[in-house]
Each structure stands twice: as structure tokens, then as C-alpha cells.
Amino acid sequence: MASNQHIGASNLNENEAILTNRVAELERRMSMFEGIFHALSNRLDLHFKKYDVVVNSQQQQINELTAFLSTLLNDQQRHAEILSEKLSGTLHGVSATSISLSQTLDPQGFTDGTTAPGAPRNYTSVPMNNDQTAHPQNEGAVSNETLFEDILNGNSQENDKSQQQTNSSNSISQENNSTNPSVDTRFNKPQNYNSNLVPSLEEYSANPPNNDGGQSQGLYISSNSSQSRQSPNLQKVSPNHENAVESNAQESVPTFEEEQYETKTGLKRKRIVCTRPFEFIKSPHSVMEVWKEYTEGVNGQPSIRKMEALYQTAWRRDPAVNKRYSRRKVLWKAIQTGLNRGYSLNYVVEILENSRYVNDKQKVKQPIGWLCHSSHIPETLK
């Protein structure tokens, strides 16, 4: 019995040892798996963070690219609109020029006398005028045929009537030939032609002749009295038009001009175009010079305030001009602030001039460029 109990106790001890070893092995494996799981989770977290950074950077780049493309498309659309406006303005100018030239070269513009205000004017071409001159000749031909038939029939009275009709048709054709000359005599330049008094195409597009319905203007002026007596129809130039042509010939090329086009309601302004770059005062010596440049203009140029009102930013597209404008804008704004607060112009200029002094005893001043920085503007003018 004692031996059996001893054997049973030893077996229990062995089983407990085996269970303990298995439990320890399982705990070790569980801890190992837990460590592997934590390592994998940490690694996944790192990968997720990297992916988030990459996705955010890509999204930012996509947003920047989208903004750039939208800006580029807007600029292209605006440029296309500007080009279309310029093209339409050019077409309007060409059409207005052709209309004014057709009115200028109208044969009725070289005839004497005035027509009624409500009377329509003839703007037909040369072939139609030739048809009109040839029409009385056709009537004369018909009258000759009737005359031949009347002679065959022996009707003397109808013969006299047909002869009267023939004479009247010939007189009408001669009058038409005198009033409406041929193409060669009508459009050839006379000997007293003066090229300085003929306005150019640009002048007719900008200032087309007024259609007053009764008084037409000629293009040529006779300088010889005998020739003027022989061709009185060529002296239909009004004194206002002559003075305008001579003044346009004497004036130089304008700096600032307006593009105009003609519509059904009259001549309208298209837009104002700046034809030369703006020149700032180089190294101004006082604040008053800078202010006068902004408000009054110098060297025959308009004021910068007027340039901004007319052209916005179109007049300072040059980088150098835009940079100088941005620097001096600080000084103009300071003066305007002082004026808005009720200070006089002389007082504001005196404050700015006093702030330029480096040494009051030697009267040494900083340049105007130093004063164009916002940090150097006095506090009372900020």
C-alpha cells in the first residue's frame, strides 16, 4: 500500500511538472506572438503615416496645378476676348473707312448747288451710271424705229413727233454726259491736285465726313484762278474741313489716342490706347515734385492719377515702370492720408521733408527713395 501511494504521488508530481512546462511554453509563445503583433502594428502605423504624407502632398500638388490651370485658362479667355474686341473694332473701322471713302468719291459731291434736305442721294456705282446714260440712247433707238415705221406708213405728223422725241432724247443724253462724266475724266487727278489736303484713311476712320444731306465736300482745291473758273465743281471744300486737314498735317503723332468705331447711332469711343511708355522723374529732389507728378503730370505727360483712372494697370506693364510706381505709391498714400485728416498740403510736405534730415545742423537729407519705404513714413501720416 505504501509503495502504491508513493508511485501515485510520483506520477502526480510528474504530471504537474509536465503541465507547468506546457503552461510556461504557452505563455512564452503568447508573449512572442504579442511582441510580433505589436511590431507589425507599429510597422503598419508607420506605413500609414507615410501614405498619409504622400497623399496629402499629392493632393496639395493637385490643388496647386488646378489653380494654375484655372488661372491660365482665365488669362487665355481674357486674351481671346481682348483679341475679339480688337478684331471687331478693326472691322468696324474698315467698314467705316469704306463707307466714308464711298461718300467722298461720290460723283454728286463735285456738282454745284444743294439738294433738298429730304432728297435721297445717289450712291450707285459707275456701271449703273453708265446704264443710266445709255438709257436715253435706247429710247432714241426706239423712236428711230417708230420713225422708220411712220415713214413707211406715210404718216407725216407722226414723223414730226418722232423727230422731236429724238432731239429731246439726244439733248437729255448730252446733259447726262456733261453732269456725269466718264470714269476716266471723273476719277483722274486734276493738275491742281494737292496731296497734303487729301486726308488719309486713318483720318477718315477716326473722323468720317458728315452726311449733311445737302452739302457735299470735295477733295481738291484749285490754286490758279483761271483753272478755278474752268472747274468750279472742284471747289466744294468747307473751311472747317480744310483747317482740320491742315492741323492734322502739322501735328505730330499723338501720344494717347482713342480707338473709335462707327455704329448706326453715330461715332462711339471704343477704348483709349497708350502708345508710349510712361517716364517717371529720375531722382526727384523734393516731395512736392513727386506729388505734382502724381496729380498734375510733368514733361508733357498726363498725371499718374489720370493714367490710373483711364488705363488701370495697362500703362505700367513694363516691370521697371511698375516697380517705380509701387515704390512711390507709399509716398502718395502718405500725403493723401494727411490731406484726408485735414492737414494742408504744405504742412504734410513739411512733415515729410523734416523726416528726411539726418543731421539738423548740417542739413543733410536722405534721398526720396529712402522716404518711399513705409517704415520711414512718420506716424502721423500712416
UniProtKB/Swiss-Prot annotation:
InterPro entries this protein is in? HOT1, TF_GCR1-like
* A GO BP annotation: positive regulation of pseudohyphal growth
**Annotated region (Leucine-zipper), positions in chain:** 12-26
- Region called Disordered, residue ranges: 104-138, 155-260
Query: Low complexity composition bias: which ranges?
Result: 162-180, 222-231
Q: What is its main location?
A: nucleus
What disulfide bonds does the UniProt entry report for this chain? Answer: none
GO CC term, one of those recorded: nucleus
User: What is this protein's record name?
Assistant: Protein MSN1
Q: Which organism is it from?
A: Saccharomyces cerevisiae (strain ATCC 204508 / S288c) (Baker's yeast)
Taxonomy, top ranks, is: Eukaryota, Fungi, Dikarya, Ascomycota, Saccharomycotina
